[in-house]
A protein has these predicted regions:
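Accessory RNA-recognition modules of RNA-modification enzymes
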Residues: 1-187
Length: 187
């Protein structure tokens, strides 16, 4: 019943400011302005660290960030999902183009820092849209999904899958629903 760092899905937008500084975080309400965030009390700690590490790697791989106003650039968003019970970690790199220069070296570099990542997926979103994920994706490392266990059931989680972001409280809520349903076994 942890009130902190419970979000097992974390996403960040990327932007390069006028001074050339790469920022990762969330959009300011009603704008394309990215507010920089390195960590958040509700987000998974490892997910936050992965996002910061990717941001720091971008210049060495000459990767540009996507500009919402011009529709140009490479990296749009990052999505990190972690299985609460399994500790499996998925890194999704949302790009504006399918071409991913130095992808193998980039994958090696991020895995060197975070060997606990079990899969890395490139999701391609070339459209000028507010939707984070595009229709197409490529598995760069691992199986392209993670698994987690919730209420004794195993779930396979893909980049586009909906999955409860707070599994501990979800199990409490589902348990209460079952209790209040007062099931007898012959329904």
């Amino acid at each position: 019943r942890q009130p902190y760092h419970y979000r097992n899905k974390v996403q960040a937008a990327f932007y390069t400011d006028k001074k050339g500084k790469i920022i990762s975080g969330v959009y300011q309400s009603g704008s394309h302005h990215v507010v920089g965030i390195d960590s958040c009390q509700t987000e998974d700690v490892i997910a936050d660290k992965i996002i910061v590490a990717v941001r720091k790697l971008l210049p060495s791989f000459r990767m540009t960030t996507y500009n919402e106003d011009t529709g140009k650039g490479f990296l749009r968003h990052i999505l990190v999902k972690r299985g609460f019970a399994t500790n499996q970690i998925m890194l999704v790199l949302v790009t504006g183009t399918p071409v991913f220069p130095s992808k193998n070296n980039f994958v090696k570099a991020i895995l060197k820092q975070f060997p606990e990542i079990t899969t890395i997926v490139q999701n391609i979103n070339p459209y000028r849209t507010n939707l984070v994920l595009g229709d197409n994706q490529k598995v760069l490392y691992g199986k392209g999904y993670i698994e987690d266990i919730l209420c004794g059931c195993r779930f396979r989680i893909s980049p586009k899958s909906f999955y409860q972001i707070n599994p501990v409280q979800t199990e409490v809520l589902y348990g209460k629903a079952i209790e209040f349903a007062n099931l007898k076994g012959n329904e």
